[in-house]
Amino acid sequence: MISRSFVAAFVATGVLAGSSAVAQDTIKIAYIDPLSGPGATVGEVGLKTFQFLADELNAKGGAAGKKFEILPFDNKTNPQESLVQVQKAVDQGARIITQGNGSSVAAALSDWIAKYNERNPGKELIYLNYAAVDPVLTNDKCTFSHFRWDANSDIKMEALTNYMKGQKDIKKVYLINQDYSFGQAVRKAATEMLKAKRPDIQVVGDELHPLLKVTDFAPYIAKIKASGADTVITGNWSQDFALLLKAAADAGLQVNWYTYYAGGTGGPTSVKQTGLNHRVFAIQEGSANVDHAASQATEKAFREKFGVSNFYPRAFNQMRMLATAINKANSTDPTKIGLALEDMKFEVFNGGEGFMRKDDHQFFQPMYIVSLGDIGPKEPFDEEKTGWGWRTIARLDAKDTVLPTSCKMNRPS
């Protein structure tokens, strides 16, 4: 676990840069995510990931002759607090904003940044979203200034349900999700896609619970047991996943789990406690055990430096593509960066090609369905020192993950 005092020290100073970066004439990236409160476990790992990437890029000379500098801001997973923090970031000279945890936060930031850009021509900002996956952000609420590197929740559910439709042992499914825009999107997509692909499956429960406020999931697990479900689908993340699985372990609940974020901090430990060996599945853009030499070497270096696994291959794609776009544009102007990112094709962290769709600024990339359990000789990494690690069950090429968009974007004139 990353020291909270370590993070707090850098938040207090407002700077977390590559080791050789200096404050003046750097490419400032404001990292706005939870560094305190219930979401801090994932926010801290995200911050270290961006620190690692700043160091990596700066060691290669940065971009357009400038070094990268990470400015951390604690939003406490709160949309209103995020708007306070983004204004602070702008005041400190940041014109590149990144955030990932919480689609309600993402929606607030995207709207604020779009309006800021309208009011401040020539001083525009760009928002790089590495993990907030409500589909609306690249559909009805798309903006030119917003780019997303994680697959949206509909893309992920499409992949999961395509796999699930072939699993004939699935008869009864229980949905449990966080009660905000993302969780609501997960339940909607799961219900509609299961009905279309496996109409014989019964949805025996559909539960929403408060975001990052539940400390004991035992009552929810009791409902799942009583329903007779053989399978649970959840988009829960951070402590809402870890505590949910801990309660499942305590109750001896023996079901299959189809998840988005089983790999988040605390998740693998809770999964191991359930004893559900390769019965907890996740849809991800990669994993430590993908057979790819370059990413496994980076994984090893990341773990040696921080003592945690790399949960954000998408952040690697984002930062490396940002550097490529800056070099292509030969400019750090956000509008020019955005134009350079559009339709960019890129070799992704775990191998294979991804592309940034111009129509809506959604990044498409190879996706993996993985399960957590005992590791074999071709799976070198475990998770959270549990002895369990990821195994690839299915891989989808980027072209096979594409869904249509309703985005009607106002573009720079």
Question: Which residue stretches match the model-derived regions?
Answer:
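Extracellular/periplasmic Venus flytrap/periplasmic-binding protein
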Residues: Q80-V84, P135-V136, F144-G252, A288-A297
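Extracytoplasmic "Venus flytrap"
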Residues: A30-Q51, F73-Q80, N101-G102, I176-A185, ...
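Bacterial N-terminal signal peptides
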Residues: A8-A17
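Extracellular/periplasmic periplasmic-binding protein-like sensory domains
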Residues: T143, L245-M319, N327-T332, G376, ...
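Periplasmic-binding protein-like
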Residues: A89-S103, N120-Y130, K172-N177, G228-S238, ...
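Sec/Tat signal peptide C-region and signal peptidase I cleavage site
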Residues: G18-A23
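Beta-alpha junction/loop-to-helix N-cap segments that form part of ligand/metal-binding clefts
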Residues: T26, T41-K48, K60-L137, W149, ...
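Solvent-exposed, acidic/polar segments of extracytosolic/periplasmic ligand-binding ectodomains
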Residues: I27, F346-S413
